[in-house]
Amino acid sequence: MSEYVVGVDEVGRGSLVGSAIVCAFRSQNSFFQVLPFDVSDSKKINKKKREEIYNYFKLNKGFNYNYQIIVGKKKFIEKFNIHNVVLQCMKRSIILLSKKTDTVIIDGKFIPNGMEDYKVKALVKADNKINQVSAASIIAKVYRDKLITKLHLKNNVYQWNKNAGYGTKNHLDAIYSHGVSKFHRTTYQPISKLIKKLST
């Protein structure tokens, strides 16, 4: 029987708003040979195609692959910082999804503590190299986009549907004009600097 590989990626680390999302995706390598589409890094494909892939994975989940989504909430990001929260979410996703015989590949440079019983590797730009990580990246990206769209409907002045909460000029200008919302990560430097500037 072919080896199973688990790919792990996160989305939303650099956003000024809301949660970060971690996804772990588990399958055999041969799984990607029979897909009706090519899997690539979610940053390189358009929104419509990402959503099509996401819907396919969601509809057929559990047949010959599986995935696990973990949400790193804003309150924990502000309390423990984004790096620690993402690592803990990755650890949880691996424990919930993978078997100890699986090879686990994390996009990036860091491996969570307490993973000694698992075969875990960290690989920079793994979302460009490993299909399971690419799939995880797509799922995490679309899942987070849906969350951000819901936040946008509550706070449309910030145009989160266009900037996904990242520090674009239109987003920062909106914060200057309308202030900081309860969904902003106030410990992030661009936001904390704006808060300080607006309070003087």
Residue ranges with predicted function:
Residues 1-200:
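RNase H-like, Mg2+-dependent phosphodiesterase core
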